UniProtKB/Swiss-Prot annotation:
Family label: Belongs to the cysteine synthase/cystathionine beta-synthase family.
Stated name of the protein: Putative cysteine synthase
PANTHER family registered for this protein in UniProt: CYSTATHIONINE BETA-SYNTHASE
Modified sites of kind N6-(pyridoxal phosphate)lysine: K41
Catalytic activity: O-acetyl-L-serine + hydrogen sulfide = L-cysteine + acetate
EC number annotated for this UniProt entry: 2.5.1.47
Keywords: Amino-acid biosynthesis, Cysteine biosynthesis, Plasmid, Pyridoxal phosphate, Transferase
Names of the cofactor(s): pyridoxal 5'-phosphate
Length: 336
C-alpha cells in the first residue's frame, strides 16, 4: 500500500517474543517504537487532534498547546504538520534532550517552564499551568490536556485490535506503564472487553502517586504522576487488576540489559514494565502469553540511561539486576 501522509504509518507495529523457560510463559513485546514519531503516543496524539477538529474545539489552522515530556509532543507535531496546525510544546528540564530536538525538527515551538527544580524533579504542575494559560490566551488555541482528554485512551483501540490479530492463541496478561493513564486504560478496557479474564498490571515509578504511595522525585521520563500533581481523569482504576512500582535502577538496568542481550533499544519506562513482567512471571503470578509495549526506543536516551558515566554519577548502576534477569530468563546467573 502506498501511503500519502506520515500519520498513515502509525500502527501495525510488529511483535517479538521472549521465552521464559520453565515458567509456562512467553513475554511478547509490541514494538511501538516503530511508529513514525518513535513511540506509542503517536496513536493518541492523532486521536486527540482528529477529535478536536471534528467537534470544533480546534479551528482549522489553529494552535495546539500541550504539556509534554516529549513523546506526546512528537506525536502532536506530526499531526499538526498533516492538518496544517501550529504546535506549542510546554516542557521542563526533565525531558530527554533528544526528544526536544525531535519536536523542534518537526516544527514544534518549545516553551520551557521557569523555576528552580531538582534534576530528578518532574515539573508537571508548572507545565500544565503554563499550557492551560497559553491555550486560554492565544487566539484559536486549544490546550489538549492529555490527562483528562477522553480521546487519549480511545487512541489505543487499534493497538489492541492489532494484538488480537497477531496473537490468535489469545492474550493472558498485559503489563503496561501508567502515566496519564491513557494507554493503560485504553488497552486494558479493550482487552477485557475481548476477554474479561485477562490480567492487567500497571507499572509506575517508585515516587509516583498513582496508586497512593508516598511521592518523591524520580528519573524515569514520561511515566507516573509526581507528587503535587493530580492523577489524570482518563485513568480507569476499574480496568486495572494490580498497580506496582519499579525503581529507576530496576527500570534503567533492564533497558540496558535488553539492549545487550536482545539487541533491542528500549526506553526506561519500557525497561520498568519488562522488569515487573518478568518478576511476576518468575514468581508464577503470570502465565501464558504476557504482553507489554515497547512504548518508545532507547535511541532517545543514549546520553542518559545508556551512558555509563551518567548512570554512575546518579548511583543508578546495579549489576545485581542483570544477574536477576538472567535468573528469570535462563534459570541461572550469567556474567553481566
Amino acid at each position: 500500500m502506498l501511503h500519502t501522509t506520515v500519520t498513515q504509518l502509525i500502527g501495525q507495529t510488529p511483535v517479538m517474543s521472549i521465552d521464559v523457560p520453565g515458567r509456562n510463559a512467553t513475554l511478547v513485546l509490541k514494538i511501538e517504537k516503530n511508529n513514525p514519531g518513535g513511540s506509542m503516543k503517536d496513536r493518541m496524539a492523532r486521536s486527540m487532534v482528529i477529535a478536536a477538529l471534528q467537534d470544533g474545539r480546534l479551528p482549522p489552522g489553529g494552535t495546539i498547546v500541550e504539556s509534554s515530556s516529549g513523546n506526546t509532543g512528537t506525536g502532536l507535531a506530526l499531526a499538526a504538520l498533516e492538518f496544517g496546525l501550529r504546535f506549542i510544546a510546554v516542557v521542563d528540564h526533565h525531558a530527554a534532550p533528544d526528544k526536544i530536538r525531535m519536536m523542534r525538527a518537526l516544527g514544534a515551538e518549545i516553551r520551557y517552564v521557569e523555576g528552580d527544580f531538582r534534576e530528578d524533579e518532574v515539573a508537571v504542575v508548572e507545565r500544565q499551568r503554563l499550557a492551560a494559560q497559553l491555550g486560554a490566551q492565544l487566539p484559536g488555541a486549544l490546550f489538549m490536556n492529555q490527562s483528562d482528554n477522553p480521546a487519549n485512551p480511545e487512541g489505543y483501540t487499534g493497538l489492541v485490535d492489532e494484538l488480537v490479530a497477531q496473537l490468535p492463541d489469545g492474550i493472558d496478561a498485559f503489563v503496561g506503564c501508567v502515566g496519564t493513564g491513557g494507554s493503560m486504560t485504553g488497552i486494558s478496557q479493550r482487552l477485557k472487553r475481548n476477554n474479561p479474564a485477562v490480567r492487567t498490571i500497571a507499572v509506575e515509578p517508585a515516587g509516583s502517586i498513582v496508586f497512593g504511595k508516598p511521592g518523591h522525585p524520580y528519573y524515569q521520563s514520561g511515566t507516573g504522576t509526581p507528587a503535587g500533581d493530580e492523577v489524570g481523569k482518563v485513568l480507569d482504576y476499574g480496568c486495572i487488576d494490580e498497580g506496582v512500582q519499579v525503581t529507576d535502577t530496576q527500570a534503567f538496568e533492564t533497558a540496558r540489559y535488553i539492549a545487550r542481550r536482545k539487541g533491542l533499544l528500549v526506553g526506561g519506562s519500557t525497561g520498568g514494565a519488562i522488569y515487573k513482567a518478568l518478576e511476576f512471571i518468575g514468581a508464577g503470578k503470570l502465565t501464558g502469553t504476557v504482553v507489554t509495549t515497547v512504548a518508545d526506543g532507547g535511541e532517545k536516551y543514549l546520553g542518559t540511561i545508556f551512558d555509563e558515566e551518567w548512570m554512575a554519577k546518579r548511583r543508578l548502576l546495579d549489576p545485581a539486576i542483570a544477574a536477576q534477569l538472567d535468573g528469570w530468563l535462563f534459570g541461572k546467573a550469567r556474567a553481566a
